Amino acid sequence: GLTMEGTAPGAAPRFVVTGEISCIYKRHGRTRKVHNLILLPSLEAAEELSVRLEAIGNIHSDGRPILGLDSRDLLELTLETCPEAEFIPAHIWTPHFAMFGAFSGFDTVEECFGDLADQIHGVETGLSSDPPMNWRVSALDRLSLLSHSDAHSPSRLGREADLLDTGLSYPELVQAIRTGEGLLGTLEFFP
């Protein structure tokens, strides 16, 4: 969450428009299953992206839509629709539904996202790992390590979080993810 410094007592909560999409697709003869997070600057941007995604599949059937769309292509479509969007591979070490998943993933960010790999600025580490584990993987050195809880698991909201020292705006949040400035670390649930 964002720091609350400078907010008035009783101020309304602030939200970041986000969604998680499950991409299930074939590439190089293997079935890939990768969950990705998308952060958007506004509800209007979310509506525009929703319209484009509805043309591909049913995004209303679940709290985490499943699309037969390559993760690289979802990233491209997202950035075409909203250049200010931030795209983050989710719980990257989960065995069955993650970028580095043992049963359905890839070995590198570049293998997953190809020519758009430089548009990935952070990864969500998930419950399957902790910061010291991730710090040992040199391929992650250029990326911000993030830790989130799932809105599709309401009873578990807040069990993991990012520790930020930024202003309370979407551009400042994204800047922290992209540069690491203002990203102090993560709050981790016990393993």
Feature-to-residue mapping (PLM):
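Extended substrate/RNA-proximal surfaces in nucleic-acid metabolism proteins
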Residues: L2-H121
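Short, charged, surface-exposed secondary-structure boundary motifs
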Residues: K26-R27, E47-S50, S155-R159, E172-R178
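Histidine/acidic-residue-rich catalytic or RNA/ligand-binding cores of hydrolases
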Residues: F97-F106, W135-R136, S155-G167
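Glycine-enriched alpha-helix->loop->beta-strand junction motifs that scaffold or abut catalytic
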Residues: D118-H121, L140-L146, L163
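Acidic/histidine-rich catalytic cores of soluble enzymes
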Residues: V123-P131
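Short acidic/histidine-rich active-site segments
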Residues: R142-R159
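Cys/His-rich short segments
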Residues: G185-P191
